[in-house]
Amino acid sequence: HLRGFARTIPSFLMAYGTEDTTLANFDQIVPDEVFQEVTSITLEQFRFLRDGGDYEDTATGETKHFDGKLFDEVVFDDSIKEFLRLKRELANYFDPANEKDIFDYIPPQRTNQIFTPKATVAKMVSLLEEENPGCFDDPDKTFIDLYMKSGLYITEIVKRLYQSGSMKAAFPDPKERLEHIFEKQVYGLAPSEIIYRIATNYILGFSEEHNGKQYNFRMCDALPYAKDGTLSEKLDELFG
C-alpha cells in the first residue's frame, strides 16, 4: 500500500501542488474523494499513518496507540521540492531544448492515468497532418481531444499551430496568436477531476498569463456519450 501511495504523489503534485506543499499540509490540497479514488485509502487513514492516534485492536478489543511518523518528513518534503522544480523547468513545451516532459517523472497508475509517450503523441499529430494537409495553417480549423490524460496531444497541436507560417502571417503578434489558438481552435475533455487538473496545468502551465484560465477544456467523461450516440449533443451543451 505504501509503495502504491508513493507512486501517486507526483500525480497529486501535478494536479494540486504549490510551492507551499509539504507533508504537513498534503492532506489539505487534495479532495477526499479524489484521494481515495487514486490511492484506495481515505485522507483520514493517511492522517493516521502520518500523525498517529488511538485505534482498536480488532483481535483483543483493546484501545492501543500508534505513533504515526510512517513518512520521513525531510525526504517527503525534499521530493516535493524536486518534483515542483522539474515541473517548472519543463513547463515550456515550446522550448526545443526540453526533450523530456514532466510525465517522464509521473509513474503510471492502476487507474486511467497512463500517459502516452511524447514521441508517440508527436507521431499521432504528424499523421493527422498527413491526412489533413494544411490543417495547422488554417485559423478556423478546430481540434478536440475527447479523452485527455496528460494534455500532451493538445500541446503538440498548439505548437504546430503556433509555429505555422500561415498562422504567423495571420497573427504576427505571438500573444495574439496564442490567445486565438486557445480561445478558438483547441478543445478537450478530461474524464475525472485529477486528470482535468493535470492536463490543464500542463497545457497552460508554460505561462502565468494563461495558467488558471479555463478556455475550452472541460471535465467530462466522453465515453458514455460516445457509447449511446449522444456525444455531439453533449459537445454542443459544453461548448455551445
Regions found by a protein language model. Give the residues of each.
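SAM-dependent methyltransferase catalytic region
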Residues: 1-240
